[in-house]
Amino acid sequence: MAKQRHSKSRQIQPTPVASGNGVAPKSMSRRQFLGNSAAGLGGALLATTPLGAYAQDLEPFIPAPNSLSNGRSGGINTGKPEKDFIEEMRDYVIAISRWAKSYRSDFAVIAMNGLELTEFLEKTLFDTRGVAEPARNYLRALDAILVEAPFYGFENYGEPTNAEETKYILGYLERLKLEGLQYLAVDYTENRADMNKARAQLKGLDALYYAAPPPGMQLSSLAKVPSTPFGSNPHVIDNIRQANNFAMVLDSSPYGTKDAYVEALAATNYDTLIIDPFHRGTIPLTYDDMKRLRYKKTGTPRVLISYLNIATAETYRYYWKSGWRAGSPDYVSEGNLMARWGQEHHVHYWTREWQSIIFGNESSYLGNIMKLGFDGVLMAGIDEYAWWLDY
């Protein structure tokens, strides 16, 4: 039986590294993003959203669950909208997946954390504690799940994750093995012995493993240990299931220029690269950049996955407008004090207005990511439901 709880965020101190100089960078306009991302890219643009594509319009495959995960007040927080925040997030992710895969069926949809969304807790007549059942529709929408710090770095870089947390994470992954999902694990350590221990514990789960280097949990450089990727190979990698390894670099500011950043990543043999589609959060990658990143150092293709925060508004992104603040527009809430890089606001992620920024038409964030040629998306912010439950 699964123990249900709300996601616990690691205590990351906000540091505005996205700007590289400690101040909020200048916003990139939607037109600039479109122009840069589509440069040199032929073919038809993604169509506008068909009716019923947003999460609010989804017709569920199964009845809504009687879920204990709705929290102590049925998902209602004082002063907050009356919402089942967990089910709203599930519907949102499902809608994103359906829309993306309607244009490219092999587009990989990866959830970052948020393991609690994978199961319902159903009360029964004889067991009021709840019986765990897989959230089938949500799981069908995913190709993979990435978990952070299952063994090292949950609280502080290089320190072992507490045993209870590790057991909790591995318990979910063990139960979900039969669902056919690919697992990716990111630890925060540079100790090779620790990496070997972690990989041994993941062996039965066939998970891809990456140990991010310091500083902290900023994911701002490539790992130096080991010197070559685990399972390095010269093979053609067409999808994430063929990959033996991956690297994850989300803050490129330490590299200086975009060319230096792209060159550093291109000169690796990782089967999969998970990266931000913007250099330093503001300068979009181009089609030419993507062509350079597409091939491993060996010359064979690899998989490129884009990072996308689907549930917090990042103030340095192209979509952020100068007049926005908490409460204006209505779907923007207060600042996220625990953001990985600061400069973020919680949002009403269940609203059509916010979702239309993220996906559903050719000028949406995900629309541009797909036009640029990424093979999939890593969705961050999935565990935002916990903030709304615990507010």
Language-model segment annotations:
Residues 1-32, 44-50, 54-56:
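N-terminal secretory signal peptides
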Residues 37-45:
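Sec-dependent signal peptide hydrophobic core
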Residues 58-391:
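Glycan-processing catalytic domains of CAZymes
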